[in-house]
A protein has these predicted regions:
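Acidic, small-polar-rich N-terminal luminal/periplasmic segments of exported/outer-membrane proteins
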Residues: 1-106
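Flexible loop and strand-edge segments within Gram-negative outer membrane beta-barrel domains
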Residues: 180-206
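Short secondary-structure transition/capping segments
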Residues: 33-37, 150-151, 194
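Outer-membrane beta-barrel translocator/receptor signature
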Residues: 48-50, 62, 71-74, 85-152, ...
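Juxtamembrane/interface motifs at transmembrane-helix termini
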Residues: 32, 82, 158, 201-204
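Glycine-rich, histidine-containing beta strand-loop boundary motifs that form or position
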Residues: 25, 141, 183-185
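Conserved thiamine diphosphate
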Residues: 170
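Short intrinsically disordered, low-complexity coil segments enriched in acidic
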Residues: 1-6, 96, 174, 180, ...
Length: 206
């Protein structure tokens, strides 16, 4: 996924057969598997999807979550077809099951920077290690920026840019050799200058 630049579901769908994601903005997002899932349009704002989205076993109830950047993940599992037996409701079309990297008592750190055209730059970092003999932590960061792709002649600025920031913190408590307790928390912000729409190939836009 990293080599392909798939830092969210919208990018990852290009690598996953039968998955479609349509999004003009996070509140107006539809995700389908094999053509079924949720409608695309203003009618889906606030509605549960037919494709379940899970991160470390936690259900994200709104399709808008699929527009967020992945933060320090280890795998993406795409389950096609009804998954009610394993995941419960809202999985009539399938489910995304995402697993993040866990905190470790062994010290470690990762850092990655990517760049591209239109001022695209992405930075990812994570640090993990022991705090005490029974407590370990992991802190992760992801930031993505890109200049706008559409010139707004009224404001003299490029719009439809990317401005994403995400953080995740984990605590791992080792109660004994058979029992561990994990506490996760994350925060993600999207602050783009969008979402401009243009008429393509019909009239001159002004």
């Amino acid at each position: 996924l990293g080599d392909a630049g798939a830092f969210n579901v919208n990018r990852a769908k290009e690598l996953i057969p039968s998955v479609q994601l349509y999004s003009s903005n996070p509140r107006n997002t539809g995700i389908n598997i094999r053509g079924l899932g949720s409608p695309f349009g203003l009618t889906n704002d606030g509605l549960d999807a037919g494709v379940g989205y899970y991160v470390d076993g936690v259900y994200y109830a709104r399709p808008a979550a699929t527009t967020l950047d992945f933060i320090d993940i280890v795998q993406i599992e795409v389950l096609r077809g009804p998954q009610g037996t394993l995941f419960g409701k809202n999985t009539t079309s399938g489910a995304f099951n995402i697993t993040s990297r866990k905190a470790s008592f062994k010290p470690g750190a990762d850092f990655e920077v990517s760049y591209g055209n239109y001022g695209y730059i992405q930075a990812k970092a994570s640090v993990t290690g022991a705090l005490t003999k029974k407590l370990a932590a992991r802190v992760s960061f992801s930031g993505t920026q890109r200049d706008g792709l559409i010139d707004n002649i009224a404001t003299k600025r490029a719009t439809n840019d990317i401005n994403n920031l995400g953080f995740r913190a984990q605590l791992l408590y080792k109660l004994n050799n058979k029992t561990t307790i994990t506490l996760n928390g994350d925060n993600t912000q999207q602050r783009p200058d969008g979402y401009a729409q243009v008429v393509a190939g019909v009239v001159t836009t002004k």
